[in-house]
């Protein structure tokens, strides 16, 4: 065993070790990162935690904290990935949202690669159309989520995806059409005669 008490440490009920924002334990010269500190226990986040710990240990003043929004990926078939808020999470907070969905089987690249199943879902704030969450299930979902992750960090709105010119044919275009879908849903809820943007006009 590790004999943690000999180092002045103790594991919690789930075998994890408590750390502060710098991943420093109660023993100042001992740091912990990764699975041993608990959720989310992912490779990507573990590496970021280790960088933060190293920077603090050597007083480098560079990367002082882990990014507030993290991506989560499950490498199943099909892949699943997300970043930001979920519909259930927002509902529990009493925060309204508009969801927009684009399916792989209606996307040119999705058709080319034979991805009959899969979708990208984007969550927006109804009033400002600020992006709140991104969810993907399907081929390359763990890659696809990164576009949304960057947009979340930038505090982007639907305008970013509408105004961006995506390569054609690519799965990246799903962002534009999921946004069109969200705008259409919002227009319908507001009783507007038509959505402010027409996806068909893009073709």
Task: Cite the ranges covered by each PLM segment.
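Rossmann-like dinucleotide-binding cores of NAD(P)H-dependent redox enzymes
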Residues: 40-47, 55-89
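FAD-site-proximal beta/loop scaffold in flavoenzymes
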Residues: 1-61, 143
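Hydrophobic pocket-lining residues within nucleotide cofactor-binding pockets
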Residues: 36, 70, 104
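Flexible, glycine-rich terminal cap/loop adjacent to redox cofactors
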Residues: 58, 75-203
């Amino acid at each position: 065993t590790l004999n943690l008490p000999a180092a002045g440490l103790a594991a919690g009920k789930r075998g994890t070790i408590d750390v502060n924002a710098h991943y420093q334990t109660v023993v100042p010269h001992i740091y912990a990162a990764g699975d041993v500190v608990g959720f989310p226990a992912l490779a990507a986040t573990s590496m970021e935690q280790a960088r933060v710990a190293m920077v603090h240990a050597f007083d480098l003043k560079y990367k002082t904290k882990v990014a507030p929004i993290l991506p989560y990926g499950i490498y199943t078939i099909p892949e699943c990935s997300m970043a930001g808020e979920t519909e259930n999470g927002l509902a529990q907070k009493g925060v309204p949202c508009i969801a927009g969905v684009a399916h792989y089987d209606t996307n040119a690249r999705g058709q080319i690669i034979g991805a009959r199943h899969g979708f990208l879902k984007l969550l927006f704030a109804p009033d400002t159309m600020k992006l709140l969450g991104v969810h993907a299930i399907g081929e390359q979902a763990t890659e696809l989520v990164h576009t949304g992750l960057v947009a979340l960090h930038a505090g982007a709105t639907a305008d970013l995806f509408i105004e961006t010119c995506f390569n054609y044919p690519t799965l990246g275009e799903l962002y534009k059409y999921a946004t069109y879908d969200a705008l259409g849903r919002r227009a319908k809820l507001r009783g507007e005669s038509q959505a402010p943007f027409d996806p068909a006009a893009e073709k």
